């Protein structure tokens, strides 16, 4: 930290106080956003923090002027938070910011217009990020992380403020998305349901009136929830909406959407192009796609094992594991095509021994009972049309469309 004289510290603090009060007086939301964006680590805020750590009695400056003292509670907590943030005391920074945020929300509630909505977004974002950092600090010191959960409670309070009628309600979706990020981080995604119900069933909300950015984020998170619920058609609809409306320059965001949309599409029998996987660095799906195309169960299992940690973290491992049935279907189709070339008259009759032999070639050693069980499941799931002749150990395939395409429908439960 560069040396700051007492006089310079006084000047910097007074300048911030004037800029804050001007922003409120002239309803200048963009300036207010910059004044509250701690995580941006902007030079003006860092220099203010240095000044606050030199001039310790900033509260006296606030009290000296009626103009400043009108927002005294807000400003005092902002200063305390920024001081602590600058010296790396993230827990104290969070606690002070939480008090500031509550005071700011109360002030926002009293303002008739929605001029400060963007500034409120900054407050919601900053408290979530600061809570995550504070919890990381607490965990590293062997203490219980609890700040993000508390931040979630504040965000719910903000949602309640915005969920009424009037121009402020357009901000409800942004706060909802911050709540989603909080709940996903905490592993309490079940708490998302009440907020979703408010957005999707309340008559005061028209989804199309929300900003595009927020709609994309909302569809991304609700799409992920549908993946966890294994409601793949709904997940496809929501994630596809997010992809189609995402800013094409935001490649990182597109990749985040595709991390979930690709396994959803695969579950619906839709295989992405190799070019898509290359363009967005989704190499973890390359071998899975190859396994589906080839009917290679060994390759699928190898790909799942190779990227197991990544798939588990994303929550798509079980979704991808269930693709085994589609791989079996592709393998049966290959056996059928080969038999059709060598013995057209009996192409629709697949011997279980022949299937077992093909599986052994893929290092999948199964006895006939296991093969029969797999074929029974494929028939039950409508991935194969036909029936099992148990005594003769033969699968008799339908002569009409023996391997139905999913055509965007999930494998039946």
From Swiss-Prot:
Can you provide one Gene Ontology molecular function annotated for this UniProt record? RNA binding
Q: Which tissues carry this protein?
A: Expressed at low levels in roots, leaves, stems and shoots. Detected in seedlings, roots, leaves and anthers.
Membrane-crossing residue ranges in chain numbering:
none
Record's subcellular location: Nucleus
Pfam families, A to Z: PCI
The impact of changing residue 152 to E is: In eer5-1; enhanced ethylene response
For the PCI domain, which residue ranges apply? Answer: 216-402
Q: Which InterPro entries match?
A: Csn12-like, PCI_dom, WH-like_DNA-bd_sf
User: Does the record carry Nucleus as a key word?
Assistant: yes
Q: Which PANTHER family match?
A: PCI DOMAIN-CONTAINING PROTEIN 2, UNCHARACTERIZED PROTEASOME COMPONENT REGION PCI-CONTAINING
List the protein's name. Answer: Enhanced ethylene response protein 5
Q: Which organism is it from?
A: Arabidopsis thaliana
Gene name of the record? EER5
């Amino acid at each position: 930290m560069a040396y700051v004289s007492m006089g310079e510290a006084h000047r910097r603090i007074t300048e911030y106080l004037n800029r804050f009060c001007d922003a409120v007086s002239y309803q200048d939301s963009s300036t207010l956003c910059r004044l509250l964006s701690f995580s941006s680590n902007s030079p003006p805020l860092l220099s203010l923090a240095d000044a606050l750590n030199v001039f310790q009695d900033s509260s006296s400056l606030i009290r000296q002027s009626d103009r400043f003292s009108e927002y005294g509670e807000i400003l005092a907590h902002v200063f305390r938070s920024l001081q602590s943030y600058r010296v790396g005391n993230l827990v104290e920074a969070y606690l002070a910011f939480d008090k500031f945020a509550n005071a700011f929300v109360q002030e926002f509630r009293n303002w008739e217009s929605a001029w400060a909505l963007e500034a409120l977004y900054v407050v919601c974002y900053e408290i979530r990020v600061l809570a995550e950092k504070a919890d990381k600090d607490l965990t590293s010191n062997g203490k219980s992380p609890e700040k993000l959960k508390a931040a979630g409670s504040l965000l719910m309070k903000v949602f309640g403020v915005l969920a009424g009628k009037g121009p402020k309600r357009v901000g409800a979706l942004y706060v909802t998305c911050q709540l989603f990020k909080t709940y996903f981080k905490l592993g309490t995604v079940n708490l998302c349901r009440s907020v979703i119900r408010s957005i999707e069933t309340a008559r005061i909300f028209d989804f199309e009136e929300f900003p595009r950015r927020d709609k994309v984020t909302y569809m991304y998170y609700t799409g992920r929830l549908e993946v966890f619920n294994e409601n793949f058609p709904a997940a496809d609809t929501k994630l596809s909406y997010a992809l189609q409306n995402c800013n094409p320059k935001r490649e990182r965001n597109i990749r985040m959407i595709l991390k979930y949309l690709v396994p959803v599409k695969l579950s619906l029998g839709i295989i992405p192009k190799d070019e898509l996987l290359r363009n967005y660095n989704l190499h973890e799906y390359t071998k899975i796609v190859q396994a589906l195309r080839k009917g290679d169960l060994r390759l699928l299992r190898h790909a799942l094992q190779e990227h197991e940690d990544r798939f588990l973290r994303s929550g798509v491992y079980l979704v991808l594991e269930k693709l085994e049935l589609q791989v079996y279907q592709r393998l049966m189709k290959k056996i059928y095509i080969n038999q059709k070339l060598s013995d057209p008259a009996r192409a629709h009759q697949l011997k279980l021994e022949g299937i077992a032999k093909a599986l052994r070639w893929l290092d999948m050693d199964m006895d006939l009972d296991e093969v029969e069980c797999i074929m029974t499941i494929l028939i039950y799931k409508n991935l194969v049309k036909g029936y099992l002749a148990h005594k003769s150990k033969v699968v008799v395939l339908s002569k009409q469309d023996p391997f139905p395409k999913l055509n965007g429908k999930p494998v039946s439960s």
